[in-house]
Amino acid sequence: MIILDNSIQTKSKAYSISKLITINTLGPEGTSSEYAAKNFITNFTLLQGVNSKLSLHDTFESCIEKTLQSPLEYTIVPHAYDGIKHFYMRPDLQLLQIFRCDTPMYGLAVRPDFEYTDDMLDKAVIVSHPSPINLIKYFTRKDVTFDLVNSTSAAAKRVKDGLSDIALTNELARQKYGLQFVKTFKSIPMSWSLFGKGEIHDEN
């Protein structure tokens, strides 16, 4: 995608920026991916005069499927996501941009009425997205058992709903679900890739 005057230019066609583009990323609300996508929309698409909306999905793979349907659909993926390597290999996708956006603060969150003690880490199961779990290792030096879910926001929701007691999550999800941090770790320095629909040409 190239922003040129009043159009979005691909190799084969130009689209008026009056058309709405969609930025797809991982949901639900409260994910670090949503935070990064909103940052991208504010600092890139709006400044370029491009009309855009945000669409949240359960998996990055679902985001990519939407992107493959139209050159006006894009997907933002963090480089911490292990499955991103497959997206780079696909001939029907193209890497359009890489940008940095550090995540919100990460920490261990519990319900306000839950009585947390540090020794719980030796036996408790912590609900988390797979990507940030090494924060526990580096900051607590403990070998913790995890219950893995699709996003940090989903982890926080499980604690809010009483399905788990401790979540590794971010500040946005903590606020959204009314949890409190019992430990804070760090805002994770992160880079992100923006993918668009590729243009495949047969070579015979």
UniProtKB/Swiss-Prot annotation:
It is found in: Cytoplasm. SUPFAM superfamilies: Periplasmic binding protein-like II. Its EC number is 4.1.1.100. GO terms for cellular component: cytoplasm. Keywords: Antibiotic biosynthesis, Cytoplasm, Lyase. The keyword Cytoplasm applies. Pathway: Antibiotic biosynthesis; bacilysin biosynthesis. The keyword Nucleus does not apply. GO terms for molecular function: carboxy-lyase activity. One of its GO terms (biological process) is antibiotic biosynthetic process. It catalyses: prephenate + H(+) = 3-[(4R)-4-hydroxycyclohexa-1,5-dien-1-yl]-2-oxopropanoate + CO2. Part of the bacABCDEF operon responsible for the biosynthesis of the nonribosomally synthesized dipeptide antibiotic bacilysin, composed of L-alanine and L-anticapsin. Bacilysin is an irreversible inactivator of the glutaminase domain of glucosamine synthetase. BacA is an unusual prephenate decarboxylase that avoids the typical aromatization of the cyclohexadienol ring of prephenate. Belongs to the prephenate decarboxylase family. This is Prephenate decarboxylase. It comes from Bacillus amyloliquefaciens (Bacillus velezensis). The gene is bacA.
